[in-house]
């Protein structure tokens, strides 16, 4: 109940915290890439783009004072979180099967440069042999598993924020004549 009251009173702060969480997750990914030496697969890169989109949308929503704007941007952010969770779930699914059952795909940048977007996106989501590899884990969960958990939690928080915002807007709206 206390969480709901906090969300009701400070929706812009919640959006700013979600944006900061996305930036922190991106920083973790860059640390794993540049310091630890892990090379991101195509699906990891798509998840990074989803995090960037989520950070931008929630950052903009926290900066806008008009309720209609933050509700619209929050709804787009919730859809972006759902997309990121879907890609992370797909990658987790690929990891749960033996590597020999996953066919190797093309390089991410090669797909983008060689194919139109309508053909590149299905190829990226299909994954590659690299997407099935588990090179690092924390508490038994792969990066894809943790990514799914983060996207799902951020998406649920955004949905709760939207539900409270829409409910509050309905209560304050004048009654129809």
UniProtKB/Swiss-Prot annotation:
Which intervals lie on the Periplasmic side per UniProt? 32-49, 90-145
Q: Which residues lie on this side of the membrane: Cytoplasmic?
A: 1-14, 65-70, 165-177
Transport as UniProt keyword: yes
Key words, A-Z: Cell inner membrane, Cell membrane, Chaperone, Disulfide bond, Electron transport, Membrane, Oxidoreductase, Redox-active center, Transmembrane, Transmembrane helix, Transport
- Cysteine-cysteine disulfides: 41-44, 104-131
Q: Where are the transmembrane segments?
A: 15-31, 50-64, 71-89, 146-164
**Annotated Gene Ontology MF terms?**
electron transfer activity; protein-disulfide reductase activity
Q: How does it sit in the membrane?
A: Multi-pass membrane protein
One GO biological-process annotation of the entry reads: protein folding
This protein's superkingdom?
Bacteria
A single Gene Ontology CC annotation of this entry is: plasma membrane
Q: Where in the cell is it found?
A: Cell inner membrane
Query: What is its biological role?
Result: Required for disulfide bond formation in some periplasmic proteins. Acts by oxidizing the DsbA protein.
Name listed for the protein in its UniProt record: Disulfide bond formation protein B
Which gene holds the coding sequence for this protein?
dsbB
């Amino acid at each position: 109940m206390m969480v709901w009251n906090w969300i009701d009173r400070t929706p812009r702060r919640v959006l700013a915290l979600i944006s900061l969480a996305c930036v922190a997750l991106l920083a973790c990914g860059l640390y794993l890439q540049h310091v630890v030496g892990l090379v991101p697969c195509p699906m990891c890169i798509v998840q990074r783009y989803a995090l960037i989109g989520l950070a931008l949308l929630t950052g903009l929503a926290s900066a806008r004072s008009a309720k209609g704007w933050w509700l619209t941007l929050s709804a787009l952010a919730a859809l972006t979180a759902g997309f990121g969770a879907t890609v992370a779930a797909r990658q987790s699914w690929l990891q749960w099967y033996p590597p020999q059952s996953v066919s190797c795909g093309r390089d991410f940048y090669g797909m983008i440069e060689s194919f139109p977007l309508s053909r590149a996106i299905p190829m990226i989501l299909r994954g590659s042999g690299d997407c099935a590899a588990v090179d690092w884990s924390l508490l038994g969960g792969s990066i894809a598993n943790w990514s799914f958990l983060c996207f799902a939690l951020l998406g649920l928080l955004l949905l709760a924020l939207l539900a409270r915002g829409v409910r509050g807007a309905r209560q304050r709206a004048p009654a129809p004549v």
